[in-house]
A protein has these predicted regions:
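Conserved short alpha-helical segments that host acidic/polar catalytic motifs at enzyme active sites
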Residues: 1-127
Length: 127
């Protein structure tokens, strides 16, 4: 089972999300990711491994915003062979959205074709 957290606050949420992910993780986790939103810009950091080794000080400084999502992944199918498979996912079409899901996608090939071959713009992403 994956761990998911969302926080909306009057203060920056990066540290609260990080602390929450530390509490949600356990052995078997293969990747983690945090996305924050500052005004209309998403800030994303994803990495393989455990939370305490995935985020450095510079990563946390870049995750500014008062809205954020965090995810720790426990593979039930496949594994995080690349950071691109870690969540949260950013989808640009039609306007830009960040999403996290807890489950197996059964139409991954169709989704991959749509996301990577058709919708290539990423205007709201800052990494």
């Amino acid at each position: 089972m994956c761990g998911i957290v969302e926080i909306v606050s009057s203060d920056d949420v990066n540290q609260q999300i990080y602390d929450s992910l530390l509490l949600l993780q356990h052995r078997g986790q293969d990747s983690t990711g945090i996305t924050t939103m500052e005004n209309t810009i998403f800030h994303i950091h994803k990495a393989k491994g455990h939370v305490n080794t995935a985020y450095r000080t510079r990563d946390m400084r870049n995750l500014i915003g008062k809205i954020g999502l965090g995810h720790v992944r426990y593979a039930t199918k496949g594994s995080a062979e690349s950071v691109e498979e870690a969540q949260p996912f950013y989808v640009n079409a039609p306007y830009g959205i960040v999403l996290i899901h807890n489950g197996n996608l059964t139409n991954t090939r169709d989704l991959e074709k749509q996301l990577f071959n058709v919708d290539k713009r990423h205007t709201h992403l800052k990494n």
